[in-house]
């Protein structure tokens, strides 16, 4: 069906949304026979994509998903399911809304992204080629929703096709490449080259082809009809120039969209599976009313697994985020760790890190040099262990330098593990400093990004832990209830639906109110 023919009949059906994402953790079973196999995660984008698609699907939206075909990560038997057989397999699923970008560069990968900075743009180009040449013509979407820099070329092509496009900025990372590289990947860049963002003003196609680099993230913002960040405050911080490390091109293009009234911040939400009432990874499930004894049991189970002293009465701090000193602030904790633990040694305070990253080694060094065995645990990331960590801990550490959204501080509240955060971005939008006497607030917030600020906030957490049990339990139960009501993916999905409907100028779901 041609675009023109489709437009003449489009009013007779629900608008069709194509979500283009390089990461996903799961998809609803009703979207196709392969939905249960699809899990490719590098960070929060995968969780957010999965939650949004699931919520849109549950609300009755005609939502489709395009993602790379990571055969190895999807646990598909590559030896028995070669490309031709896969096409036959997919042809038996007429209702499938899952569209896999086929390229050998995806098939044998163990991770979504490469450690090689040269390889990641090649992966993005292969994904883009399949989306533009095969998936969009097949799906015939009314609106395309792109996510992060790997999809940054798609909005330019979508604008050329006359398809409205929403671009979500999940983080500030970007890559650069040339029109020649785009051409060599099998993409007809001449069709939409003028809709891309370059390091210098382009005069013509040939002049720009080999030397004028394209900024992929800025191109996505520049060419899209509407953009969103994943928290209102992070958008405000970008527009007001609060962070000097944000690339100038990206900041200016976001400012332009904001001035035009085409930018908004939508707070992400944790996945529906982040629920202590049903979580299969924790020792004892619980809700706000039963959290006290259940969290004690979970604490002992977690302590046993990570090698901490088994005692349900000691305060436990939990670090669930990757150990990335450029964003997540592990160096702040490393700076104060010995002094903080020394001050509270008699109280037997414990800290557990379940996270990967370049800063894991300094924590191992601190552990062994100061012989903090039984008090400090440093473990590789494991999803089940991380979930148990939320259920076991009293406090969740999220001292990020900047945070486009952040999910750990929200998940912590759902599990009764109060967050300790730096006042920035999505952390500002989701955490208010606790006043236990007034039954207000939900965590511990420091404003100045340095180790003394984190130390102050952790001391406030210890003060709260020393409160009378009834005060502590009352506030934790309140935080859990409020978090459950506020942080859910249906609320997030409805915010996206409002944008979709604004862009389409018609309802997305007939029954949506």
Residue ranges of model-derived segments:
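Catalytic cores of nucleotide-sugar-dependent glycosyltransferases that transfer UDP/GDP/TDP-activated
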Residues: 1-513
